[in-house]
């Protein structure tokens, strides 16, 4: 959701809350009438909107970090030539893998700091678990990925999603992480949309209480 749209929603919330609070300071008859009208729970809706938007922003940051690993994968077996193009340089990929591992730990750190409403906590935890599993897989394959002269074959199995020759050194976990982030982003968008819908829903009058 764009920043301007979110600002408009939050301003609307502020106006709603201000109007509700001003009514409570009026006369008794006005307050009695207000109590017969059931409106949205503004405090709860405000929290859902704030939480879901924070999650969306964080997911975008993490997705950008994840994309940087995809870019690193394009450089497997490559070197910079003097004309600015990339030439072949086989089996020297240890720095690429170290970079991917550093990024994966940063992703885990960002997800660890993320809090969300009840409907998002489970998906946040799932994404964090996937990130940890990817980092662990790279670390556990230190004998092949943490040595001087990491082969193109092993590097591709670690971080190249399109590798058809194998994905057993990290790619499987990387794909799961990507999927979990998509699921988290979708859930946050749905919560935000539902909260806005709830905010703009018509006020319903309660049935008068029997004497």
Swiss-Prot record:
Q: Any one cellular component term from GO for this entry?
A: cell surface
Where is it mostly found? Answer: membrane
Swiss-Prot/TrEMBL keywords: Cell outer membrane, Lipoprotein, Membrane, Palmitate, Signal, Virulence
Signal sequence interval, chain numbering: 1-18
Q: Which Pfam families match?
A: Lipoprotein_6 (PF01441)
Q: How does it sit in the membrane?
A: Lipid-anchor
At the top level, the lineage of the source is Bacteria
Which positions anchor the lipid (S-diacylglycerol cysteine)? 19
Q: Where in the cell is it found?
A: Cell outer membrane; Cell surface
InterPro entries tied to this protein? Lipoprotein_OspC (IPR001800), OspC-like_sf (IPR036437)
Quote the residue positions with lipidation, kind N-palmitoyl cysteine: 19
Quaternary structure, per UniProt, is: Homodimer. Interacts with tick I.ricinus salivary protein Iric-1, Iric-2 and Iric-3. Binds human (host) plasminogen.
The function of this protein is: Major immunodominant protein in mammalian hosts. Required for initial stages of mammalian infection. Inhibits macrophage-mediated phagocytosis of the bacteria. Binds human plasminogen; this probably confers an extracellular protease activity on the bacteria that allows it to traverse tissue. Interaction with tick I.ricinus salivary protein Salp15 protects the bacteria from antibody-mediated killing in vitro and in vivo.
**What additional remark is attached to this entry?**
The causative agent of Lyme disease, the bacteria has an enzootic lifestyle. Larval ticks are infected with bacteria during feeding on infected hosts (mostly mammals) which retain the bacteria during subsequent developmental stages. It is transmitted to the next host when it is bitten by ticks. During tick feeding (which can last for several days), bacterial migrate from the tick midgut to the salivary gland where they are transmitted to the host.
Q: Which family does it belong to?
A: Belongs to the OspC lipoprotein family.
Identify this protein by name.
Answer: Outer surface protein C
Q: From what organism does this protein derive?
A: Borreliella burgdorferi
Ranked from the top, the taxonomy reads: Bacteria, Pseudomonadati, Spirochaetota, Spirochaetia, Spirochaetales
């Amino acid at each position: 959701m764009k920043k301007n749209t979110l600002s408009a929603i939050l301003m609307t919330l502020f106006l709603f809350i201000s109007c509700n609070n001003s009514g409570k300071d009026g006369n008794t008859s006005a307050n009695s009438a207000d109590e017969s009208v059931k409106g949205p729970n503004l405090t709860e809706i405000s929290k859902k909107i704030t939480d879901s938007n924070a999650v969306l922003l964080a997911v975008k940051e993490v997705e950008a970090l994840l994309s940087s690993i995809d870019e690193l994968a394009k450089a497997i077996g490559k070197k910079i030539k003097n004309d600015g193009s990339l030439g072949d340089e086989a089996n020297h990929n240890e720095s690429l893998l170290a970079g991917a591992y550093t990024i994966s730990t940063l992703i885990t750190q960002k997800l660890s700091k993320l809090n969300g409403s009840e409907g998002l906590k489970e998906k946040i935890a799932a994404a964090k678990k996937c990130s940890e599993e990817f980092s662990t897989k790279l670390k556990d394959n230190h004998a092949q990925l943490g040595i001087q002269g990491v082969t193109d074959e092993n590097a591709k199995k670690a971080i190249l999603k399109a590798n058809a020759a194998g994905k057993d050194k990290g790619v499987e976990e990387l794909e799961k992480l990507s999927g979990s982030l998509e699921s988290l982003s979708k859930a946050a968008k749905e919560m935000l949309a539902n909260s806005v819908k709830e905010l703009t829903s018509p006020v319903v009058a309660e049935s008068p209480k029997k004497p």
